[in-house]
Amino acid sequence: MPSTLLSLSIPALLIIYVFLYRRFKHRPPLPPGPKGLPIIGDVISAISPKTVGDMDQPDWARYLDLGKKYNSDLIHINVLGDHTIVLNSVKATDELLERRSALYSDRPRFAMVNDLIGWDWNFGTMPYSNEWRLHRRTFHQDFQPSAVLAYRPVVLRSTSVLLERLAATISDLSPTAHVEHNDLKYHVHNHAGSIILRIVYGMTTQEELDDYAKMAALAAESMNESLNHGTFFVDYFPILKYIPAWVPGATFKRKAKTWAPTVANLVNRPWEKVKRSFASGTAIPCIATKHLEKLSNGGDQPQSGDQDQHEDMEEVYRSTTGVAYFAASDTTVSLVMTAIFVLSHHPEIQAKAHKELDSVVGNSRLPDFSDRSDLPYLEAIFKEVQRMYPVSPVGNTHRATADDVYEGYFIPNGTSVIGNIWAVLHDPEAYRDPLKFNPDRFMVKDSEQPPSPELYAFGFGRRICPGKHLALETTWLAIACLLATCDISRPHGADSKKEIHPITDFTIGLTVHPQPFNVRIIPRTPTALKLMKNGYPSEDM
């Protein structure tokens, strides 16, 4: 019997060997990258990142350094058998994540984010599936460009409040004093939060705003620390999620235990509150009440193609409204704060914007959305802020669902694929002199303009952020109003030659913010101060 088994097994082993030999012999090479060590790969650099000053080097900078080292816009990293390919150019992201999006729209299963913290209700982390399609389609219906037009009165009202509160803060200061970072950020947080809470949940009180702002901030912390690929080893070894939190080295379990209740409350508490108001007939019309109305009428059930997913439409609505509040508030705050920080370093650019705004808008009213097409230099500033200092420097991780070949390099099925947004928006092939803040690059005729940063700053392909239209409208109006009414500058005594450092002057995470900074915000004229205090006419809101 043993000899019979041996005689049968030898041919089988030979067949397997020949199959594997032919497959790997003729397979193209993987993209260049750190060789690492046998079995564990590049785990050493993964757990011991370089430092810049007293900060860890962010992933986008490490990926960019690797691209320069290997002279390639595709980088392969192997950590414990987990293959990751990073895309560092416009060309590579356009080809793989846009044109071949059918192969690259999946997500890896992040044990930390989805299983331990509980972000699995967020369609941004869902795998490419019917469930994801249903959630995204539902979200898109509420935040597509045509839908966002209906929210403009809310945006105008909240922008009026932002200007009024800034005017009050400025009026209490001496002529040489500056606005403290925490005061400024509080006003900007209120601005962003009030818009999305009113649109999504019909909430308008300061108490509600403060409550949900704290909750969203802690939830954002969990996402920022956990979603970047490979932050926690449990993502490489999902079985680690079963070890008790008290085990030495299980810091990730203790962090997840802290974050999970907040993430659950983020999606459940506001929805349940609106449900109670809707049932009592006191709810303010909003996206949530629109969906509750559909549910009460028995409409908007899953289409036949989605029935196999057994989707409860209330859970879909609960989840998509939760995503809207969380994502929109953090992104908008980051973009507005970054714009203020950057403009404080560029008085010459502000002067050109002031001249354009005075010519188009005048000094008797605030700019509004109808002015946007007549303010090309302001638009150029807005684009250049997004390009130079992207809110999300590294895109969410995609996952290849089949073997692929690009530029002679092999990309295996199951590989994690990351678009390095910072590298893409500083690609010298697309943006001349990319390390210089220069709005004029977008002032040339359309045929000569570089790609709009909006194509890359909010993700790629079928996974691009569908809430970007509201975020961009909200941010544009805030920046337009600030430039129309104020001079923004660094505090007295600040080093006028100190330039913004893309690493040390920003936080690290999925969404980045400027490090704490103080700024002088001075009304340009007494008339401008009056405009800030009065805001938009009530008939516009």
State where each predicted segment sits.
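Classical protein tyrosine phosphatase
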Residues: L30, V86-L96, L103-S105, G202-E207, ...
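Central I-helix of cytochrome P450 enzymes
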Residues: A192, K253, W259-E272, G298-D358, ...
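N-terminal membrane-proximal hinge/A-helix region immediately C-terminal to the signal-anchor transmembrane segment
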Residues: P2-I117, N130, L134, L156-V161, ...
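Conserved cytochrome P450 K-helix/beta-meander segment immediately N-terminal to the heme-binding cysteine loop
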Residues: G419-S447, Y536-P537
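Conserved cytochrome P450 K-helix E-x-x-R motif and the immediately C-terminal K′/meander segment
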Residues: A46-N71, N265, R365-G408
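Cytochrome P450 heme-thiolate "Cys pocket" and heme-binding signature region
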Residues: G322, A327, E407, V444-I479, ...
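Cytochrome P450 heme-binding "Cys pocket" and the immediately downstream C-terminal segment
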Residues: P347-I349, K468-P516, A528
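Cytochrome P450 catalytic-domain helical core, especially the substrate-recognition surface
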Residues: K35-L64, H83, F110-Y201, K214-R276, ...
